[in-house]
Amino acid sequence: MEEVYASELRGREPETVDTLFLDNTQGGVIGGINEKLTKLELLSMVKCGLTTLKGMPVLPALNYLDLSDNELGDDASFDVLIKCAPEIKKITLSGNRLTLDNVRTLKMLPNLMELDLSNNSSLGLLDDYRVKMFEMIPSLKILDGCDVDGEEVEEEFAAGEGAEDSDEGDSDEDGPGLSYLNKSQFSDDETDDYVVPEAGDAETRGAKRAASADCDEPEAKKSAE
């Protein structure tokens, strides 16, 4: 994991890193990362063969930890998070070997709002599993992608992006269009540069209008038909 960590830094100072992916790193233990990651908000260690969280440094800004598809079970040591990640809000633990007793410590995380425990077979067999989890962790709002009523909840960042895109679309439709701007510009140009047409010019323009009307007449008839 140390080598992957050094590679993922890509020459950056640890103090500047806010997102770190150490996925698919075998070894079974946390290593390499240190307390210099003071601004780290997202840490992903998917499929790393982890059996414990021992060795995790203090990460004061961490709010999302993804530990999917590891080997976490009786020796998970989630109590480490109480000291190392006091601000954590979301933890993904799908695809591990967890039981209800293994995750009881998570109730000590005061800011934990979202938890994914899907694909943990022992938990899935429990009667009233969802009810027990929401009762056990008072701060919990979302479990396995659904709220306390069992309604599916979209990711916050996805909803925000959608709203932003929607606002941009509305501004294009509801704001002054090109035709309005062109008309306004044309009106200003006419006011500034208007010249009284001479008689010859008027006759010529009248002829052009008549010719134009003749050209448009078949289209008008087609529309009427």
Swiss-Prot record:
InterPro entries in UniProt: AN32 (IPR045081), LRR_dom_sf (IPR032675)
Gene Ontology molecular functions: histone binding
Any one of the GO CC terms: nucleus
Gene3D superfamilies named among the record's database cross-references: Ribonuclease Inhibitor
Highest taxon of source: Eukaryota
LRR repeat locations: 39-60, 61-82, 87-107
Residue ranges occupied by any LRRCT domain in the UniProt entry: 121-161
Keyword Repeat applies: yes
Keywords: Leucine-rich repeat, Repeat
Ranges where the record places region Disordered: 155-225
Compositional bias of kind Acidic residues: 155-175
Assigned protein family: Belongs to the ANP32 family.
The name this protein goes by in its record: Acidic leucine-rich nuclear phosphoprotein 32-related protein 2
